[in-house]
């Protein structure tokens, strides 16, 4: 099951992401090293030498790493059944990053370090900034 946030603009290969998912045979999150000023605005992960996420904190005040998680996920079909448990525990149904944070404490979740860009364009200001970036690149 592929989940993509509708307010993201990305230029990396979903095919490569899917190939990685098949290789690790586990749920996956797109991750990448991010700039310090972006850390408080996104989920931050810690991964082991096999890219398995062992800590995932959504929008931390004191980030433990510079690896940010983006709202691009692939879940195993069996994992989708755990959404019921997640919601029964009273977790936020409107914060998609909280589910993989919860999930990585229950089963293997892997970080796919992607090449390319992924922008959150969920606010008018963010959308305008990305429009300007693309305008400059085309000149």
Where are these regions (language model features)?
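Catalytic-core segments of class I nucleotidyltransferases/pyrophosphorylases
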Residues: 2, 18-22, 52-139
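Conserved beta-loop-beta/alpha segment of the NTase-like Rossmann-fold superfamily
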Residues: 1-48, 84
């Amino acid at each position: 099951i592929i989940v993509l946030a509708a307010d993201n603009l990305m230029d990396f290969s979903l095919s490569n992401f899917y190939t990685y998912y098949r290789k690790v045979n586990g749920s996956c999150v797109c991750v990448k090293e991010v700039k310090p000023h972006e850390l408080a605005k996104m989920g931050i992960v810690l991964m082991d030498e096999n890219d398995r996420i062992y800590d995932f904190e959504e929008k931390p005040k004191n980030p433990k790493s510079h690896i940010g998680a983006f709202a691009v996920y692939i879940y195993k079909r069996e994992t989708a059944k755990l959404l019921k448990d997640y919601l029964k525990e009273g977790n936020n149904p409107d914060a998609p990053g909280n589910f993989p944070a919860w999930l990585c404490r229950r089963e293997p979740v892997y970080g796919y370090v992607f090449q390319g860009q992924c922008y959150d364009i969920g606010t008018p200001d963010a959308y305008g900034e990305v429009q300007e970036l693309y305008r400059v690149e085309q000149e």
